[in-house]
């Protein structure tokens, strides 16, 4: 069907007959880069993150999904907040979880968790003497490990596409049960495409009233061009008064698409 160049207002348009999972998050999630799943674990929004976790786990039935890229079509769509909270709820299950801030252009994980960014992914890739154990930080009061971006480099795409990155990812796969890579938007730079081709699955974050339909479709095409395994879509920024369900999710399986 023809897609108009308008902002996303509801889930019905989602990719015509090619829609996959849609997981709704209400508008509380954009009240700053806060770790809502820890600050308010009994809130509706925290439960929504647990719902997303459950849906990802269902996708693991037929194949192992250990490494996940989180991305979006553009900025301000909530991918970094979603990444942090999703990593947090996975760690609540006793799993060994690592959040990697692989947005080497506008990193946020160090701000979200209030930790140092003097060293991180970029220094781990560029300094042979630096080790994973020296660089990863465990968040106080949780079982969650975070690998911040490190200093912003002049060559993000080259670092992510390097042999050293491939070797690092293999090491992390051996150390952790779940690894979430927070990436830049798909349509702005090639970083997300590079990483999407390396991981087990991709979660795409779409923001109600912000994301442009044509941009989302273009981003989906770019991911499919590198044979990315798109696990599903998170639709966030839903207001109570918009007429949508305040919590919950919609689901369309691959077989129904």
Spans of features found by a protein language model:
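Hydrophobic micro-sites
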Residues: 4-33, 217-257
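Extended, non-globular alpha-helical segments
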Residues: 33-61, 131-133, 148
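Walker A/P-loop phosphate-binding motif and the immediately C-terminal alpha-helix
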Residues: 44-113
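Phosphate-binding loop that captures ATP/GTP phosphates
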Residues: 90-148, 212
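Conserved nucleotide-binding/hydrolysis micro-motifs of P-loop NTPases
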Residues: 104-106, 130, 151-154, 186-187, ...
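Phosphate-binding/switch loop-helix module in NTP-utilizing enzymes
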Residues: 131, 149-189
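Inter-motif core of Ras-like GTPase G domains
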Residues: 191-209
